[in-house]
């Protein structure tokens, strides 16, 4: 078995809450008294471009929410979106301990829109943990498409067999495995620690 050199981490559902998922959108509908079917239909049409960084947050909101007059301001809705992001303290603590060992290259590999991604990087000090951010909004590619994994491997110059992808969604992991990457489906920190150890990743002190 090839020795592990690089850990790729999903963000939402692993170290943080999801940035703008179905639960967040349902809460927005409830909070701002929106029509779910209309909003969700517009969201689905804009999602690919939004997460690939092809449109800005303001345009996404103009197309999905503010295509007509509302009783609330754009800034109020933006603030709601950003406030939805919250940390998983145990995950961040474990991530920090691994990063401080400096035994492995650590990188984010996530789907996220530009403004929410950069808010999360800044708010939760993710530069302290990750050396690189292979985010959909920067690469203009999304998981589970094979190209985003291939691009990350080429940029890092890593062999798939020496990399582990940690993600909470099985489909994302399936596609990575097809390229030869090792994978762990995240459920909790204790389970992650055990599975990393099985791959030979040193987690001493964690």
Where are these regions (language model features)?
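Short, acidic loop-to-helix structural element flanking the phosphoryl-transfer center
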Residues: 66, 75-107, 118, 146, ...
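Generic structural signal for small/hydrophobic residues in well-ordered secondary structure
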Residues: 10-13, 53, 98, 108, ...
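Active-site neighborhood of HAD-like aspartate-dependent phosphohydrolases
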Residues: 2-42, 178-179
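Alpha-helical elements of Rossmann-like donor-binding domains used by nucleotide-donor carbohydrate transfer enzymes
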Residues: 23, 27, 45, 59, ...
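Asp-based, Mg2+/Mn2+-dependent phosphohydrolase catalytic module
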Residues: 1-4, 113-114, 118-206
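Short, surface-exposed acidic
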Residues: 32-43, 69-80, 201-206
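A metal-dependent, Asp-based hydrolase signature
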Residues: 48-78
């Amino acid at each position: 078995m090839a020795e592990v050199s690089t850990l790729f981490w999903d963000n939402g559902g692993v170290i943080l809450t999801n940035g703008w998922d179905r639960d967040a959108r349902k809460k927005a509908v409830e909070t701002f008294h929106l029509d779910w079917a209309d909003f969700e239909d517009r969201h689905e049409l804009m999602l690919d471009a939004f997460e690939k960084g092809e449109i800005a947050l303001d345009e996404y909101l103009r197309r999905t929410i503010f295509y007509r007059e509302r009783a609330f301001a754009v800034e109020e809705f933006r603030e709601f979106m950003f406030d939805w992001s919250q940390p998983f303290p145990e995950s961040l603590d474990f991530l920090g301990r691994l990063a401080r060992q400096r035994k492995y290259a650590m990188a984010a590999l996530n789907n996220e829109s530009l403004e929410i991604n950069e808010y999360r990087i800044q708010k939760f000090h993710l530069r302290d943990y990750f050396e690189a951010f292979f985010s959909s909004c920067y690469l203009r590619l999304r998981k589970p498409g094979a190209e985003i994994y291939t691009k990350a491997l080429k940029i890092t110059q890593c062999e798939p067999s020496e990399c582990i992808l940690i993600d909470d969604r099985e489909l994302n992991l399936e596609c990575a495995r097809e390229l030869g990457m090792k994978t762990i489906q995240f459920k909790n920190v204790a389970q992650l620690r055990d599975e990393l150890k099985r791959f030979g990743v040193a987690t001493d002190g964690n």
